């Protein structure tokens, strides 16, 4: 049996995919812009 590879951590999740992480880079801002244009209810994790 192999172990489950997804070991959730709220801190790691927020640091890599959170709103402030997105806003920190130009490409991250583009991600948010695309999601706003698409009409997503949640822009980031």
Curated annotation (Swiss-Prot):
As for family, the record states:
Belongs to the bacterial ribosomal protein bL34 family.
Where does it sit, as one GO cellular component term? ribosome
The organism's taxonomic lineage, starting at the top: Bacteria, Pseudomonadati, Pseudomonadota, Gammaproteobacteria, Alteromonadales
Q: Which InterPro entries does the UniProt record give?
A: Ribosomal_bL34, Ribosomal_bL34_CS
Q: Does the keyword Ribonucleoprotein apply?
A: yes
Pfam families the UniProt entry points to: Ribosomal_L34
UniProt biased composition (Polar residues): 1-10
Instruction: From the Swiss-Prot or TrEMBL record, give the protein name.
Output: Large ribosomal subunit protein bL34
The scientific name of the source species is Shewanella woodyi (strain ATCC 51908 / MS32)
What segment(s) does the record annotate as region Disordered?
1-26
Query: Which UniProt keyword terms apply here?
Result: Ribonucleoprotein, Ribosomal protein
Q: Name one GO biological process term.
A: translation
Q: Which GO terms describe its molecular function?
A: structural constituent of ribosome
Query: For this UniProt entry, which segments traverse the membrane?
Result: none
Compositional bias (Basic residues): 11-20
């Amino acid at each position: 049996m192999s172990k489950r590879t997804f070991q959730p951590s709220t801190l790691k999740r927020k640091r890599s995919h959170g709103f402030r992480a997105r806003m920190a880079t130009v490409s991250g801002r583009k991600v948010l812009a695309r999601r706003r244009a698409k009409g997503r209810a949640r822009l980031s994790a």
